[in-house]
């Protein structure tokens, strides 16, 4: 390796002896030793992002033990030993007359509540009339005559016969020759292919006590299921009370009539 000294006044270049590899290695080691304390100081001044110490690695997140006893500080046990309970924020004896009366009243209320619930269930069941045998006390799903009959099925779709969905959710295409509901048996005439509401022998339709749809007069559906009601543009809205509104204010429910757009006539300019 040849090194050249700085240029002097003259343009002559004097070659110098090359530096040996041993001297270069010694110089690099000395510079590294001098920079070590500075690095240690910088590292000590910085906060570590994570604790890599062996003690920290040994520690594991222990699962918190569940309380076996809710009485942590032993206060309830102390009250039991002294035969005392809390009553409306006051300490009274557990065997006092007030506590006994409250317990008796609470038990009496629970028994009355349960009795009323059983009465409601019994009244609802007695008012139910089976569509198949016309006997009160049970529905068609619990009718013993339906279980004996092979033609009548329960829990199936009357349109396609599937047990995975209801009749209202069926999307199957049915042959009109088989009827609207091929798997349904009429309760009135006993034939397959239609429901009792569409039976020609049933003059009352779905209105067992008489009546008809108030919109179209049909007896095969209720007012809520009427097609005219679904296709109508009438919307029932409920107004809101605003601050400062008059008590005599009434909402106008009439739908405004749509105005037809005027056709533009070409303008003629005469010169």
UniProtKB/Swiss-Prot annotation:
Record has Zinc-finger as a keyword? yes
Q: In which tissues is it expressed?
A: Detected in brain cortex and in testis.
- Where is the protein situated, by its record's location annotation? Nucleus, Nucleolus; Nucleus
Q: What is its main location?
A: nucleus
* Zinc finger region(s), CCHC-type: 128-145, 155-172, 184-201, 211-228
Could you tell me the keywords of this UniProt record?
A: Metal-binding, Nucleus, Repeat, Transcription, Zinc, Zinc-finger
Name the Gene3D superfamilies for this protein.
Zinc finger, CCHC-type
Sequence segments annotated as region (Disordered):
1-67
Q: Where is the composition biased (Basic residues)?
A: 56-65
- SUPFAM superfamilies per the record? Retrovirus zinc finger-like domains
MF (Gene Ontology)? nucleic acid binding; zinc ion binding
Biased composition, class Basic and acidic residues, residue ranges: 22-33
**Alphabetical list of InterPro entries matching this protein:** ZCCHC9, Znf_CCHC, Znf_CCHC_sf
Q: Which GO terms describe its cellular component?
A: nucleolus; nucleoplasm
Q: From start to end residue, where is composition biased (Polar residues)?
A: 7-20, 35-46
Its biological purpose is as follows: May down-regulate transcription mediated by NF-kappa-B and the serum response element.
Instruction: Spell out the protein name for this chain.
Output: Zinc finger CCHC domain-containing protein 9
Give the species this sequence originates from: Mus musculus
Gene name tied to this protein: Zcchc9
């Amino acid at each position: 390796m040849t090194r050249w000294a700085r240029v002097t006044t003259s343009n002559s270049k004097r070659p110098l002896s090359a530096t040996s590899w041993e001297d270069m290695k010694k110089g690099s080691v000395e510079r590294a030793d001098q920079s070590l304390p500075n690095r240690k100081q910088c590292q000590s001044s910085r906060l570590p992002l994570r604790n890599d110490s062996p003690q920290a690695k040994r520690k594991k997140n222990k699962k918190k033990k569940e309380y076996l006893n809710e009485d942590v500080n032993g206060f309830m046990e102390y009250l039991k030993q002294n035969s005392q309970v809390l009553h409306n924020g006051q300490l009274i004896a557990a065997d006092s007359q007030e506590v006994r009366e409250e317990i008796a009243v609470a038990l009496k209320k629970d028994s009355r509540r349960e009795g009323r619930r059983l009465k409601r269930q019994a009244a609802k069941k007695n008012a139910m009339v089976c569509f198949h045998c016309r006997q009160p006390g049970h529905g068609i799903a619990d009718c013993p005559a339906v279980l004996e009959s092979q033609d009548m099925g329960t829990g199936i779709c009357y349109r396609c016969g599937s047990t995975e969905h209801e009749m209202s959710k069926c999307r199957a295409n049915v042959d009109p020759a088989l009827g609207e509901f091929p798997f349904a048996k009429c309760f009135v005439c006993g034939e397959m292919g239609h429901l009792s509401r569409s039976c020609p022998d049933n003059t009352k339709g779905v209105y067992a006590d008489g009546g008809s749809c108030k919109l179209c007069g049909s007896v095969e559906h209720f007012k809520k299921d009427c097609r005219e009601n679904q296709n109508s543009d009438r919307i029932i809205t409920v107004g809101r009370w605003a601050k400062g509104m008059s008590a005599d204010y009434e909402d106008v429910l009439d739908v405004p009539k749509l105005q037809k757009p005027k056709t533009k006539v070409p303008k003629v300019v005469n010169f």
